[in-house]
C-alpha cells in the first residue's frame, strides 16, 4: 500500500481506505504544548517596547509632554477591561490571530456595542421604580374599543402576538365567565400601572417646569438690573448732552459780545451824505455805550428723552420706587406730566413745589399765589394752579434754569453767586431731604423767575377745580359758577351758573307745581364744584349735591345729568366710552356715556377723596394709609402703599393718603403729613 504521506512529510490530500495510525502519547503532549502561548515572543515584544520607551524618555530628552503621555498610558493600562483584553490576546498565538477571519458586519457590531468603562461609570443612579419600557407604554394613547375589537379579529385570523398563545392556553382551561373576568382584571391592572407611571411623569415634568421657572426668574432679575442701568446711563447721557448745549450757547454769546465790542472797520461805514444826516439825528455814541445790551431771555431746554422709561412697567406690582418728604403739611393737590418726569405738589403750608422724579429732588417753587393752592394740572411743560385767593395762574416749566447734574441752576446770576454758594445750593437743593429737620429746604429763588406766564382773575371765591385741554381752560369755584377761559387771549369767554342749571332741571323734571330736587342737599363742608374735566366742547362737572352734569360748551346748556351718588362728588374722569366718579358716599361708579346708565359700581369703608384711572387700573384714596387699586381687566381689588402689611388697628404708623395720580402704571400718592410716595402699579 502506498504511503499516505508525501515526500515533504505533509499529509496527502487523497482519501485513504486504511485505518488511521494511533498517535502516541508523547506526540499528543507535544501538540498540547504547542497550543500554549509562546512566552518568548511576548518577552521579545516587551524588550522592544522597553527599548523604544527608554530612547524616547532618556535623560537627555525628558519633557513634560512625555511624562503626561506616560501618565495617561499608565492609567489606561490599569483598567480591568483593558487588562482582560491584553490577557486574552496573550493566550492566542500569532498564527491564530493571523488566521482568524472576522467579517465586516461583526467588526461593526463590536465597534457599536462596545461601551467604555468611563461611560458606564458616569451613569446616574436613578431611584425610579418604573422602567424605560413602562414609560414608553405610558406615552401611548389609549385605544378605543372599536380598535381593540378589530385588533382581536385580526390577531385571531393572522399570526398571534408573542405570548398570546400562552395566555390563551392559560385562560382556555377556565370557564368563559372566568376568562372574561381574568382578562378584565389583567387589563385594569395594566391601566392602573400605566396611571401610576403617568403620575410619576407628571410629577417629573412639574419639577422640571419649576426649575425652568426659577432659572427664568433669575434671568429676568439680571435683565431687569441691566435695564435699570441702561436707563440711568441714558439719563446721564441726556444730561451731559444738555450741558454741552448750554456750553455751546454760552460760547456763542461770548462770541457775539466780542463781535459787538470790536471796533468797526472804516470801509464798512457808509459815506453818503444822506446816511450822515440820518446818523446825526440819533443819539451819540456815548449814549449807546451807557445802555446795557438787552439780555436774551433764553430759557432752559427740556431734557431730551430718547425713549420713554419703562422700568416701572417691569417691576412687581406694588413695588416702592422712592419716597419724598415734600411738605410740612397735608398735600392738597398734585400732578405729573409723565413717568419719571416732572411732579408738581401743593400743600396747606402755602407752597407749590416742582420735583424731578428721575433724580428725586426739588427743582424749585412756584411763588405768586396769596393763599393755598387747592387744585392744579400739569400738561407737558405747562402748569395751571387754582388757589383760595380766587385766582388761576399759568406757568411754563421749560423756562426754569435747572441743570440736574451739575446744579447749575442760574446761568445769568453773578459769578460770586454761582461759585461761592455752590455747596450751599447743593445742600439746599439736595436729594430727598435726608437731614433731621422736618422743614424742607428752600431752593434758590432765581430758578423759577421766568416761569410765570399770566394770571386769570374773574372768580369771587376760592378755586376748587380746574382742567384745561389745548387752548380751553374751565374752572370751578366756591362762588357756584363755572368759567371757560381762552388761553390764547387770556380772558374769560363764558360763565356757567350751576345753581341756575339745577333750578332749570328741577323745573323741567317737575310735572306739577310741587318742587322735587334732582339731587341731595348741599354739604356745607364739601366743595361746591368737586371735580371737572373738559374735552373739546364737552364738559363733565361733579358738584356737592351728588349730581354729575354733562355740559355742551357751545350752547352753555346741560346736556345730561347722571343721578346716583348720595354724597358730594370729589373726583371724576372720562374717556371715549366710560365716565368714572368718586364720591364722599364711599362709592366709585362707572357710567356708560352712550346710555347714561351705571356700568359698574363698588364701595369702600371711607369717603373717596381722590381718584384717577389709566388704561388698566382705577386708583383711589379712601381715607386709609393705602391706595385702593381696582384692576379693570380681571376685576381684582388690591392695596398699594406704605400701609400694606400693617395691622388694621394700627393707624398711627403711616399717614393717611389724600391724593393719588397714575399714568402708565406709574403711581404717585400724597399723604396728610406732606410725604409723597412713588410706586409701581
Swiss-Prot record:
Spans of WD repeats, please give. 326-367, 369-405, 458-497, 505-561, 564-603, 605-640, 647-681
Where is this chain's protein located in or outside the cell?
A: Mitochondrion outer membrane
Provide the alphabetized UniProt keywords.
Coiled coil, Membrane, Mitochondrion, Mitochondrion outer membrane, Repeat, WD repeat
Task: Show the ranges annotated as biased composition (Polar residues).
Answer: 270-279
Q: Name one GO biological process term.
A: peroxisome fission
Family matches, as Gene3D superfamilies:
6.10.280.220, YVTN repeat-like/Quinoprotein amine dehydrogenase
Q: Where is the composition biased (Low complexity)?
A: 11-20
- Acidic residues compositional bias, start-end: 416-431
What topology does it adopt in the membrane?
Peripheral membrane protein
Which cellular component, as a GO term, is one annotated location? mitochondrial outer membrane
Q: Which domain of life is it from?
A: Eukaryota
Cited InterPro entries: G-protein_beta_WD-40_rep, WD40/YVTN_repeat-like_dom_sf, WD40_repeat_CS, WD40_repeat_dom_sf, WD40_rpt
| Broad class of the protein's primary localization | mitochondrion
Using the UniProt annotation, give all residue ranges assigned to the region (Disordered): 1-25, 146-171, 259-279, 406-449
Coiled coil stretches, renumbered:
211-263
Q: Which family does it belong to?
A: Belongs to the WD repeat MDV1/CAF4 family.
Q: What does this protein do?
A: Involved in mitochondrial fission. Acts as an adapter protein required to form mitochondrial fission complexes. Formation of these complexes is required to promote constriction and fission of the mitochondrial compartment at a late step in mitochondrial division.
Official protein name in the record: Mitochondrial division protein 1
| Species per Swiss-Prot/TrEMBL record | Phaeosphaeria nodorum (strain SN15 / ATCC MYA-4574 / FGSC 10173)
Amino acid at each position: 500500500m502506498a504511503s499516505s504521506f508525501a515526500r515533504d512529510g505533509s499529509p496527502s490530500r487523497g482519501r485513504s481506505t486504511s485505518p488511521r495510525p494511533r498517535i502516541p502519547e508523547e506526540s499528543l503532549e507535544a501538540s498540547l504544548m504547542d497550543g500554549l502561548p509562546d512566552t518568548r515572543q511576548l518577552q521579545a515584544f516587551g524588550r522592544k517596547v522597553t527599548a523604544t520607551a527608554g530612547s524616547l524618555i532618556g535623560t537627555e530628552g525628558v519633557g513634560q509632554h512625555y511624562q503626561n503621555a506616560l501618565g495617561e498610558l499608565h492609567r489606561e493600562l490599569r483598567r480591568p477591561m483593558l487588562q482582560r483584553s491584553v490577557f486574552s490576546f496573550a493566550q492566542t498565538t500569532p498564527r491564530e490571530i493571523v488566521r482568524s477571519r472576522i467579517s465586516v458586519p461583526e467588526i461593526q457590531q463590536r465597534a457599536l456595542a462596545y461601551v467604555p468603562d468611563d461611560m458606564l461609570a458616569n451613569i446616574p443612579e436613578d431611584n425610579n421604580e418604573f422602567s424605560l419600557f413602562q414609560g414608553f407604554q405610558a406615552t401611548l394613547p389609549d385605544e378605543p374599543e372599536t380598535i381593540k375589537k378589530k385588533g382581536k379579529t385580526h390577531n385571531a385570523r393572522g399570526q398571534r402576538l408573542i405570548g398570546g398563545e400562552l395566555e390563551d392556553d392559560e385562560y382556555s382551561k377556565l370557564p368563559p365567565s372566568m376568562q372574561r373576568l381574568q382578562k378584565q382584571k389583567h387589563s385594569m391592572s395594566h391601566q392602573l400601572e400605566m396611571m401610576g407611571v403617568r403620575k410619576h411623569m407628571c410629577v417629573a415634568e412639574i419639577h422640571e417646569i419649576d426649575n425652568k421657572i426659577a432659572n427664568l426668574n433669575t434671568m429676568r432679575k439680571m435683565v431687569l438690573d441691566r435695564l435699570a442701568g441702561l436707563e440711568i446711563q441714558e439719563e446721564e447721557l441726556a444730561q451731559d448732552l444738555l450741558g454741552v448745549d448750554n456750553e455751546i450757547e454760552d460760547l456763542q454769546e461770548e462770541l457775539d459780545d466780542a463781535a459787538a465790542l470790536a471796533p468797526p472797520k472804516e470801509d464798512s461805514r457808509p459815506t453818503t451824505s444822506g446816511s450822515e444826516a440820518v446818523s446825526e439825528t440819533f443819539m451819540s455814541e456815548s449814549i449807546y455805550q451807557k445802555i446795557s445790551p438787552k439780555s436774551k431771555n433764553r430759557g432752559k431746554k427740556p431734557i431730551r428723552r430718547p425713549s420713554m422709561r419703562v422700568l416701572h412697567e417691569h417691576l412687581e406690582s406694588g413695588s416702592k420706587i422712592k419716597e419724598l418728604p415734600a411738605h410740612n403739611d397735608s398735600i392738597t393737590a398734585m400732578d405729573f406730566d409723565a413717568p419719571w418726569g416732572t411732579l408738581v405738589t401743593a400743600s396747606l403750608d402755602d407752597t407749590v413745589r416742582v420735583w424731578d422724579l428721575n433724580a428725586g429732588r426739588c427743582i424749585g417753587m412756584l411763588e405768586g399765589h396769596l393763599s393755598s393752592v387747592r387744585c392744579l394740572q400739569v400738561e407737558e411743560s405747562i402748569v395751571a394752579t387754582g388757589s383760595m385767593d380766587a385766582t388761576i395762574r399759568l406757568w411754563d416749566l421749560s423756562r426754569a434754569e435747572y441743570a440736574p447734574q451739575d446744579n447749575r441752576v442760574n446761568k445769568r446770576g453773578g459769578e460770586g453767586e454761582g461759585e461761592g454758594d455752590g455747596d450751599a445750593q447743593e445742600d439746599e437743593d439736595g436729594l430727598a431731604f435726608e437731614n433731621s429737620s422736618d422743614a424742607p429746604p428752600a431752593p434758590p429763588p432765581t430758578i423759577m423767575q421766568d416761569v410765570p406766564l399770566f394770571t386769570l382773575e374773574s372768580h369771587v371765591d376760592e378755586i376748587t377745580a380746574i382742567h384745561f385741554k389745548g387752548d380751553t381752560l374751565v374752572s370751578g369755584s366756591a362762588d357756584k359758577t363755572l368759567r371757560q377761559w381762552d388761553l390764547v387771549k387770556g380772558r374769560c369767554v363764558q360763565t356757567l351758573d350751576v345753581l341756575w342749571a339745577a333750578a332749570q332741571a328741577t323745573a323741567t323734571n317737575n310735572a306739577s307745581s310741587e318742587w322735587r330736587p334732582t339731587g341731595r342737599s348741599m354739604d356745607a363742608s364739601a366743595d361746591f364744584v368737586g371735580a371737572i374735566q373738559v374735552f373739546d366742547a364737552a364738559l363733565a362737572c361733579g358738584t356737592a349735591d351728588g349730581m354729575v352734569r354733562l355740559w355742551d360748551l357751545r350752547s352753555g346748556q346741560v346736556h345730561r345729568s347722571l343721578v346716583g351718588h348720595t354724597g358730594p362728588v370729589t373726583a371724576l374722569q372720562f374717556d371715549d366710552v366710560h365716565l368714572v366718579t368718586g364720591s364722599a358716599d364711599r362709592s366709585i361708579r362707572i357710567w356708560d356715556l352712550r346710555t347714561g346708565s351705571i356700568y359698574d359700581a363698588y364701595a369702600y369703608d371711607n369717603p373717596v377723596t381722590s381718584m384717577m384711572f389709566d388704561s388698566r387700573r382705577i386708583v383711589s384714596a379712601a381715607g386709609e394709609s393705602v391706595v385702593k387699586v381696582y384692576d379693570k381687566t380681571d376685576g381684582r381689588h388690591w392695596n398699594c402703599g406704605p400701609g400694606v402689611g400693617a395691622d388694621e388697628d394700627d393707624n398711627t404708623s403711616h399717614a393717611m393718603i389724600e391724593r393719588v395720580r397714575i399714568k402708565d402704571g406709574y403711581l404717585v400718592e400724597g399723604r396728610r403729613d406732606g410725604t409723597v410716595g412713588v410706586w409701581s402699579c
